[in-house]
C-alpha cells in the first residue's frame, strides 16, 4: 500500500479491505493542509475488542486501529473517522521531526521525536486532528451537537467564559470542562479562521 504495511488477523480481511480504502483516501488528502508528506507507517488492526480507539506511537513507529465502531460516533463509517484522525497525527509528528529533533532521532531512535511532541500542547494536536477529520468527511466529531454541549452549558450558565486558560487547559474535577479534543477543536478552528494555513 502507499501508506505502509497493514497487519491484521486472517479472519479480518473484510475489515482490512475497507480500512485500506479509507487509509488510501486519508493518505492522499490529510497531508495537503500541512504541506508535508510523511514516510509510510505500519498499520496494526485489532478487530476483536470492546474498545473503539486508535493511536499513533513512535516507539516503534506505527499506527494501531481498534476497529469496533464507537457507540457515540457519527453515522459516518468509524474506520474513516479513525483513518483521518490518526493519519493527521502521523503527519503532525513526522513534520515535527526536523532540526535538532531530527538529530535526536539519530541518537535515540524513534523516541528522539518525543521532546518535539512534548512541546506542542495536547489540545493543539488533538484539536487539529478532529478539525481534519471533520473537514475531510461528511461526519466527524466537529459536526456532532454533543461535541459542543460543554461550551453551550458554560455560556448559558455564565453568559461568558469565567474560567482562566489554565482551567480550560487542565480540566477540573469540580466543574464541567471540555476535554482536550473539544477545547482543541474550538481553538484550532478559531486559529484556522484567523490565520488560515499559517497556524502550523
Where are the model-predicted features located?
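Juxtacatalytic substrate-recognition/specificity segment
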Residues: 1-115, 121
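Internal amphipathic alpha-helical segments of the cytochrome P450 catalytic fold
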Residues: 16, 197-200
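Acidic/His/Gly-enriched intrinsically disordered linker/tail segments
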Residues: 60-63, 74-82, 90, 96-189, ...
